[in-house]
């Protein structure tokens, strides 16, 4: 089902706070940089995004782009209170251990690199880690550290990325009260992967957890043979939009908040210009059906094999 028509430009977390489409600052921005360099290209891109109307910036410890976000926050004319900043604790991956000695250290490092007194949303980047990778922290203990940071005012909201239902249930159990349940689960979502793990979107939406989508444009950017090509072309022509705008609008109408990025000003503008048209229920269902028949997963292949 789609959400109601005339979608607002912002969603709300279950605590009532407004959150809008995110400008991502993922690792592609630092591939040509050494770890201590600051990418002026990324700083300029964030400043451009803010100028065009983005009010949500998504970064992460693992991206190594918090310094760039901090520099942009320092230079922009947009008041800090009008910008939603999301970042993430990296608990380690494969042979790579967590960058910080603890989740609390990760939060303090984020505040310092971002140059802010608080972060609007702090996520655990992945639930797939061992205590050896995290210097001794289980998922529940990492969550307890986020709870304490929220109590201390260092973070306003807390959540997770790439969580399946069993992970979320662990976080519920580790929370002192529903006030400290995760408010966001950021997952890979696009027509070819409508549930990163079994029934995750419905579960989140039934429990007041906002689903954010990374890689919402995967059918255009990552898939070699796009089974949606004809459908997207037809809908783009019908609504006088780009195929990317059709996909982002589809994501919104599924009740999911996209995280997107581009180095091109025209595409950044397009990503914000999604609210003057609406796909019909039949069109959304057509995209759903074709997507389900052509599954594609870009990330976490092994981790979700049994989830």
Curated annotation (Swiss-Prot):
UniProt-reported outcome of changing residue 88 to A: Loss of catalytic activity
EC number, UniProt record: 1.1.1.-, 1.1.1.358
Keywords, in A-Z order: NADP, Oxidoreductase
GO BP annotation list: ketone metabolic process
Single GO MF descriptor: 2-dehydropantolactone reductase (A-specific) activity
Highest taxon of source: Eukaryota
Oligomeric form and interacting partners: Monomer.
Record protein name field: NADPH-dependent conjugated polyketone reductase C2
Annotated source species: Candida parapsilosis (Yeast)
Gene that encodes the chain: cpr-c2
